[in-house]
Amino acid sequence: MYKVIMAPTEGSDSERVAISVAVKLAQRFDADLRLVRVETTPLVIETVARPPVLMITERTLLDEHLARLHKLEALGTECRALGAIRVDTALEKGPVAPTLRDYARKFDVDLIVMSSHARGGVKRMTLGSVTDYIIRHTNIPVLVVKPPVSFIGATPWETFGEILVPLDGSVLAEQILPEVAVLASHLNLPVKLLHVLTPVTYSQKEIMQPGLPWWDTDIATANAYLDRCASYLTEEGLTVSKEVVLSDNIATAILDCSARTGAYLIAIATRGNGGMSRLLFGSVADEITRNSPTSLLVFHPKRVAVTDETPVRSEAQVPVGT
């Protein structure tokens, strides 16, 4: 259950969809919504060597601060009217990413909802300094909202359609499943589990299609693995499908599956085995976030020592992969 949802804001129009999603999620979870804006304090320059028009005065800084505060409070009022929910606003000062992280920790935030757009463009808020920092330095799920244009104004369940969960066979990758279960159950979303098989042997590289002897064992193993992962979700009453695909490009396979199935939310833990361990912060993530309208639910699980024989249990104590 999400009890406190945080939505960072900088006052731009491009974040409106993310704010709308945060409001609707707060409604569904009966959660508190915290709208947080961070302002950096510029250096006050007082010198007679410059013309007055170029001087940054304390009055100017105060006026700008009050304008940001009023805009934030107006957004809070709008969110309360839209969702009849509990909304708190906070205008913090300091470096943006660390300040957001500290705020989330201080107020026991369960979910952070962020737009994929901000000043500085898409890259800054996806793989750039702010989102990248928050994901790396917290163990809080981050929902990066990047909905298809045709779904603007839709509800989250209409926007996301289905949750796509790429899994690589590692226990750490499975730590996203409890978060998926919570979100899917409250939004009535189906879940698709995906495992991408990459070629290892020469024969596999030469002919990448199922139904051939050199793929049979790997495909059977992958399906059995996804069945084990799916069992937890189905026990929670969720509708779950699974798919094993053959590809030498993990990102392309994930994006193709998302587009083909209408799964506009990709959920993943940031650590895993092989190629998937590079999904969020490597070339795979770049391709997903820059070339796809797909939103991301990203979870950075706490670092724990594991072996293949000792499955990790998340904070929700979910025995996945046993």
Predicted regions and their residues:
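Gly/Ser-rich helix-loop-strand patches that form or flank binding pockets
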Residues: 1-3, 24-28, 97-153, 256-319
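Small/aliphatic-rich secondary-structure junction motif
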Residues: 1-55, 88, 158-211, 230-243, ...
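Extended intrinsically disordered, low-complexity coil regions enriched in Ser, Thr, Gly, Ala
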Residues: 13, 82, 105, 135, ...
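Well-ordered alpha-helical segments embedded in enzymatic catalytic cores
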Residues: 18-21, 99, 179, 225, ...
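A short acidic, glycine-rich active-site loop
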Residues: 55-70, 211-224
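Class I S-adenosyl-L-methionine
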Residues: 69, 73-81, 223, 227-234
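Short phosphate-binding/catalytic loops that engage adenosine nucleotides
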Residues: 84-85, 140, 237-238
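Charged docking surfaces used in two-component/phosphorelay signaling
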Residues: 91-99, 245-253
